[in-house]
Each structure stands twice: as C-alpha cells, then as structure tokens.
Amino acid sequence: RLTVALNLNNLLLHPFRLSADTFSLGCGIAATLMAGLIYLCVKYSKHRLMPQKEYGSARWGGPEDIAPFLDEDVQNNLPLTASESLSLSPKMKVTANDNYNRNKNVIVFGPSGSGKSYSVAGPQLLQFNSNYVLSDPKGELLQEYGNVLLSQGYKVKVFNLKDRDKSDHYNLFAYIKNEDDILVVTKNLVKNLKEDPTAKSTADPIWEEGMTALLEALIGYVFYELEPEERNMNSVMTLLLMLESQGDGPNSVSQLDLLFDDLSINKPNSFAAKQYKLYKMAPGKTAQSINVSLGLRMSAFNIPSIANICADDTIDLRELGSEKKVALFVVTPDTTTAYNFLAAVMFQQCFQILVDIADHRPDKRLPRHLRFLLDEFPNIGMIPDFQILISTIRSRDIACTLIYQSLNQLKSQYKDDWATIYENCDSMIVLGAGGNPENLEFFSKALGKATIEVMNTSENKGSQGSYTKSYQALGRELMTPEEIRTMPRNWCLLMISGVAPFYSRKYNLKDHPNYHLVEAEGGKPFDYDRRAEQSFADFISDVKDVKTVKLCAENNN
C-alpha cells in the first residue's frame, strides 16, 4: 500500500514524466481503451442528434444571406424587395462551400391591388440596366414609364392592340427564315386562335391537324412564292378566300386547288405544296368544315386596323438584341382577349430572334441584358413550348419576370408544364395570396418548418402544492397559411433558390433613386412626336457614322 501511495504521489507531482512501471502502463492502457470506447460509441451511435433542428431547420434570411448576391454597382442589381436585390452579373462568386450563381428569372404572385406594377415592374424598369419587352394590359406602363425611358435615351417601340392607330407595325413574315419558323408560327396561331388556348381539346384531332396543315401551306406559299412586299397575313387571308369551290359536286375544285396544282407540277418538292396535299387528304365535307373553322378563327385579320398594322414591319424586333437601349411595350386591351394571339406570336418570335442573335455572337450572349417584364402573363395567351424556352434563355443573358395573380393562373395556363416553369425561376416573390387555401398551403410548405421550444407548466394546488415547468421541441411552419393570408399589405415573401427565405417590406417605388424622373415625365400620354424626333436624330447620327467610315476607308486607300 505504501508503494502504491508513493507511486500515486509521484504521478501527481510529475504528471508528464514518462514511466515504464506496471502502474503507469496500466493507467495508460485503461485510459486509451476508455477513449476508444467513447469514440466508437459516438461514431456508431444510432442516435443522429440535430439540436434545435429536430423538426426542421427553416429560418428567416437576413442581410448576411443576401450579401453574396449583390452587385457593388447598385445600378446593376435587379430590385426584388425593399431590402433584397439580385446582381445581373452572369458570373457570381463561387466558393468551396457555395456557388452564388442564380438564373435571373423571377416569378411573382399577387392579387389585384397588391403592388405588382408599383413594387416589382416599376423598380426593375427604373434601373435602366437592360433592354425590356413588356406586356402592358391597358397601356398603364407605357403611360407611366414610356416618356421616362425616352428621357434616358431608350428607343421605345409600341405594339398597341388597344389604340391601333398609334401602333408600330408588326409583320410576322419579317422574322420567318425557313420551314422551321413556319411550323412554329403556325402552331402558335392555331393554338391561340382557339376560344380558350389553355383548354385541352375534346374534338377529333383531325380538325386541328387539318387546320394546321392548311395554314402551313398558305404561309409557305406566301413566303416562298410571293414578292417581299406581298408577304404578310393579308395575302394569307386572300388565299384563304380562294378556297370557295366553283361548284357543289364532289369533284368541284377551288381556285386555291388550281393554284397548288400548278405549284406541285412546277415545284414538286415545295414545302407549301406538300402541306396542301396533306390537308387535301381529309374527306370533302371534313375539308369544308376545316375551311370554315380556320376562316372564322382568322377573321381578326379582316379588320382593317389589324390588317394595316400587320401589312408591313416597322417595329424591328432584332434591335432588342443590339447594343442600343431599346424597350418594347406590347399593349393589349383588358376587356377582350380577341387579339391576344398576335401578342403570343410576337413574344415567341422575340424569344427565337434574340436567342438566334446571341448564338451568332462570339460569347453566345446578348450585348445588353434583356428582360421580359410580363405583367398579367396569362392574358397574352399561351406560348407553345415556353417551359423549354425559359430553361434555355439564361445562358444568352435573357430573363423573365413572370407576374401572376395566383398560383392557379400558372397551373391553368401551362397545365402539365407549370412545375417546370416554376422551377426555372430561381426567385419567387409573394406579394399576397388572397384566400385560396390551396395557394396558401403551397406557399407555407415552400417556406419550410422550423424547430421551436414549447414550455409546459403544471400546478398542483393540493395540501403540498407544487409547480413544475418543462420544455419540449416541436415543429412549426415558418409561416402558417393563416399568417400568410393576413400578412400586412406592405410586406412580402421572397424565396431565392438555396437561400433562407426573406420576410421583407415591398419595394416602395418612391424610394428609388430615379423616381424623380417618374415625377417629371410619368403619368403623361406617351409622346409619339418626341419619339419621332429622337428616331430621326438617331437616323442622322447613323448616317454620319456610315459616311465617316466610308471617308476613312477612302483615305486609307
């Protein structure tokens, strides 16, 4: 015992001295085994503890979460809320822990009066950091911001289906290059000329397929066989009226039949002739029904004002993909959807043209960021294959701000493809959700669940009274559906892919650094005379530049 006591005393006096005696070796081995056992218990324990995250780890984002997504140049940001923005830079910071690149597509939900134009479209326009294509129900955005953009050197184009006498002219044939384009335009027209473009047809598919083949033949004939000045939808309507048969018998022929018979003989490989043969495969009575149906759907082109603005092209959509500052307003009436098919065709051709321009540049990107600000997006009809377009435009420096009143509008417009469109928007703003339980539940689940502590108390009032208090971890939605429904009107939700969601104030347009321009220029009727003067000045400048180039070339020679 005395020896053990002396060894222990010596160990305490010199704890770090190495010793080879039995006692020291035994203690070392025991300590090593104990440490190993503890390590193995921790490593292979079946309990995977996540303190404060047992039922969910959702939390609200703060300044530190949005900071990596901001541009040092505030003018190069895309405003989302009063406190959050997103840099338009195509190359954001990439670290070992995260990649801060996000696509610039934004989807916005907000019922009428929630500030979709005031808090989203307006602030994004006033950045003046992009070229813009805007859907503009009623023309309110044109009146508010048209003169403002002019004052900042923008070339402002207007396709006005409401006040057509004030509209630039748009000829869809000006943007057709080949058979591929004919197929795309025809598909769009047939789809959007229906009473409800989003409805699934229950009729025999031969009707729609027959109309498609006939319209492809007519557009193909006009594009390939007529002179450039005759290539427009007015010529298509002229050909369509030639379908009237010269007799009532089963073997009766129309003037159009004779026209395409000659084309088949002279150009047997003609695209138009082949499509016409496909159409003629329909039985006589079926073909007559197809003729009448297509004629009725295309009747808008018989209206003189529509025929006039579609006869030639002054709008030049290709300029949107240039280095110039350009904005296009597509104004549609809010009392009828009869002319929205033209807007749908224009938007689709815009996407195709801009992608093509980008693809032919060395860096495969447009020289200026281009933003589609699509207010009341469902009102412009349905763009076929939009779910593909929105997933491919990012690399060309093109992006969309899609504005809906509700989630149901998106689901109704694109049915089976709505989720693809939603998932290709890395930013979502909820300005309000109305009272639809389905919408409220969707947004609540998108925010996620957090883990909270609930305090339980109990009190015993017997002869020996006692009071106990305990805490229990529970899961709770970051915001319940009811909390989203009763969210104050000046607050909104922002969700950016891969980042904690934000509960923020909506952007107050009056706080924008460029709002003084709206006070000076906004709210007045768009100044078409001022635009004409500006266009003339630009033309003279371009002529001078051309002359300068020619003179330099002559001097060099």
Where are the language model's segments positioned?
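Basic- and hydrophobic-enriched, low-structure N-terminal and domain-boundary segments
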Residues: R1-S114, Y118-P123, D165, N460, ...
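Intrinsically disordered, low-complexity regions
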Residues: C27, S57, G62-P63, D248-P250, ...
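A broad, low-specificity signal for short, low-complexity segments enriched in glycine/proline
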Residues: E64-E72, A82-D98, Y118-S119, A287-S293, ...
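A short glycine-/small-residue-rich loop at the edge of a beta-strand within enzyme catalytic domains
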Residues: E72-N76, F341, F377, G434
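P-loop NTPase motor domains
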Residues: R102-I398, Q413-Y414, E423, E482-K506, ...
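Conserved ATP-driven motor cores of ASCE-family P-loop NTPases powering translocation/secretion/packaging/pilus
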Residues: I390-L493
